[in-house]
Amino acid sequence: MCLILFSYENHPRYKLVIAANRDEFYARSTQPAHFWEKESHILAGKDREAGGTWMGISKKGKLSMLTNFRDPMNIKSNAPSRGHLVSDYLLDGDDAYSYLKNLEASGATYNGFNLICGSIDKLHYFGNYQNGVHEISTGVHGLSNALLNTPWPKVKKGKADLQAALEAETISPESLFNLLYDDVYAKESDLPDTGVGLEKERMLSPLFIKSSHYGSRSSTVILIDKSNRVQFLERTYNIADFTSSTVSFEFQV
């Protein structure tokens, strides 16, 4: 993922509301969200090249989400795949805090990442560009390719739009897909400097990214209500012909 917006214990009907965009090279082969064949309790997409995933949930109530930390000057060519951090947690028997504490020791071997792990009742956050494992507080949060709640333009706008969507008693998944499909560029004066150059900073600044070779490949919406009923929807975009397809799942945890 490259943008994760979420509301945690901040709505009278929902424990957790997630709206996220996955940005990736168009040529990278990806399998849309599905219940995995061998690990049939896990619902997630799959990166066909490295075998990991970027976001997933299990019928046992475990949830994990990943973004990369943008630091182009410190890319390690031989680093292990970050996508396995998500799938390993979903498969592991440890609770989120224990899993992330164990990851602290090996975190530096990976290229930059942010990882949220938890259950539907408690979330923790760890990234290898910050110290320690942190329990996430209630409220609205945003995570892109910097630390949690870093006020990049897309994060600030996304959080504000999500907060507005939370005013509804019943949240429509389509309203969350609509806020994710925002391709307006940030003002140049508001752009971060992450070392990729001004032109690329501008290209990467919208909530929904479009370019000739890289962009927002899919959007995911997850709603978990107070009775632990999960709605999981993923919309995949075909940039070649401007079409999209949506898969939807509902289950109890």
Language model feature labels by segment:
Residues 1-253:
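N-terminal nucleophile
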